[in-house]
Amino acid sequence: LYWFFLYGFIGWGVEVVYAAIKTHKLVNRGFLCGPICPIYGFGMVGLIYSVSLIPMPDSGSTSAVAIFFIGMILTTAIELVGGWALFKIYHIRWWDYSNMKFNLGGYICPQFSLLWGLGSVLMIKVVHPLLARGSSPMPFNIMLIVDVVLLVLFVVDVAASTAAAIGLNKYLREIDELRAKLRVTSDKLTTVLG
């Protein structure tokens, strides 16, 4: 859980900076209220696990090429499934690559898949080893307490954010139904007035 929350937080920070550069203002880019983007947590935990399954060569280090392809495929799959699921459940897109060439449903595109592959190499070869060294002195019982507290906060945030999104969807549905009724009335009036 520790890595999930840490990388979810780092991912949230990356998203906020990216949005700030594009929009020139600070925006919470996540679905959740708290400072975490779970898709980054899932992506990094999945990547760390996947890379750990690769047999080590004599050099004792997984090749950057292998990490690139594993990371590119894994993160693209997570982005596709996550984007599709979020849209189907909440009817909101948190990212949209529709304007990019060769995109698939606006959920994924090769340009970002290549960036995820490069990012995977950077994270596994540079960032993760530094963070692992920095967190190894933390006693297990402290880490367990931190994980439990973060998990409780995360579950509450997911529940509250989901309730808010579902409430918003209901409200938007009601507005759409009202719009449709107004359209029917407008069409009837147009017919009567000729």
Language model segments and positions:
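Aromatic-rich, lipid-facing transmembrane alpha helices and their immediate juxtamembrane interface loops
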Residues: L1-G194
